[in-house]
Every structure is written in structure tokens, then in C-alpha cells.
């Protein structure tokens, strides 16, 4: 028992510190880190604590069609690492057309979302020097999806993006 008590104290103390660190991280990022989302991960180059978690959460939320939470997660990652190009890519991706916002059965983007997505895409490109080669490929592929013109047809952009994604998926089968 004399040996067990100090061990339990150390284990308890360490677990409390980890919990406090997580709470501090959440407060600093301004968004929750949610549990139970699965284990999908896309390894990014940022080494800033918490950015990988928020990026993964943003991507999972985008894949789950919860774009508002996806955007919030990517913004939290950006807040922690303002030089994370792929984090701005993620927000631009989540701002794009999706099945939750339609008109006459077609996915649409609001004029503001079109401007915001284009702006985030340009921010990712401006930070591309901080990106890994794989991240650069993803960023440059998404560039074909947006043009900043709220009045232009999305059809050629969607076709160009689909073609660029086909080439990207051939390069990265994972």
C-alpha cells in the first residue's frame, strides 16, 4: 500500500495536467474538440499542438456534411497556427457547394460563400511555402474550384475540380 499510493498520486496528477492542457487548448482555439468521431486522420505538416486534432475534426465533419462545424474546426486550427496553409484549404473546401444547400436539386453556393472560399483558397496559396508536397498538391487542386466571381456559372469550375481531383486521387491512392 505504501508503494501503491505514490504511484496512484503520480498517475492521477498526470491525468489532471493532460485534462487542463486540453481545456487550455480548447479555450485558446475557441472551439470544442469532440469525441467519438472515429479515427480518420490526414497527417499535416503543422507541429503546433492541437492543430492536427482540429484539422482531422474539420475533415471528418466535412465528410459528414456538417459544414458549419467543419469550418469552425478549421478556423480553430488556423487560430492555433496562422501559417497552416492546409488549414485554410480545409475551410475553403468546407465552404464549397454541398448537398445540404441546393436549388432545383443542384448544389449551390451563396455569393458570400463563393467570396469567402476564394479568399481562404488564396490565403492557403499565400502560405503554400509552409506546406508539405502532398498539402501543396491538395491546395493547388482545390484552386480550380473557385474563381471569386459570384456571377459566373459553377459548372465549368465543378468540371475542372472533378478532373483535378481525378488526377490527385491517382497520385495519392490513400
Feature locations, PLM:
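Sec-dependent signal peptide recognition
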Residues: 1-7
Amino acid at each position: 500500500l505504501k508503494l501503491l499510493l505514490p504511484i496512484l498520486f503520480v498517475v492521477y496528477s498526470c491525468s489532471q495536467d493532460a485534462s487542463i492542457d486540453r481545456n487550455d487548448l480548447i479555450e485558446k482555439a475557441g472551439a470544442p474538440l469532440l469525441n467519438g468521431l472515429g479515427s480518420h486522420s490526414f497527417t499535416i505538416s503543422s507541429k503546433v499542438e492541437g492543430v492536427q486534432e482540429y484539422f482531422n475534426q474539420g475533415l471528418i465533419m466535412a465528410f459528414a456534411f456538417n459544414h458549419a462545424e467543419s469550418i469552425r474546426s478549421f478556423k480553430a486550427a488556423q487560430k492555433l497556427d496562422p501559417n497552416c496553409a492546409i488549414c485554410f484549404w480545409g475551410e475553403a473546401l468546407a465552404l464549397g457547394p454541398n448537398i445540404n444547400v441546393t436549388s432545383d436539386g443542384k448544389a449551390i453556393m451563396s455569393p458570400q460563400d463563393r467570396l469567402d472560399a476564394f479568399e481562404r483558397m488564396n490565403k492557403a496559396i499565400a502560405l503554400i511555402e509552409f506546406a508539405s508536397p502532398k498539402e501543396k498538391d491538395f491546395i493547388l487542386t482545390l484552386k480550380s474550384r473557385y474563381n471569386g466571381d459570384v456571377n459566373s456559372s459553377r459548372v465549368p469550375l465543378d468540371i475542372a475540380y472533378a478532373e483535378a481531383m481525378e488526377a490527385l486521387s491517382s497520385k495519392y491512392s490513400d
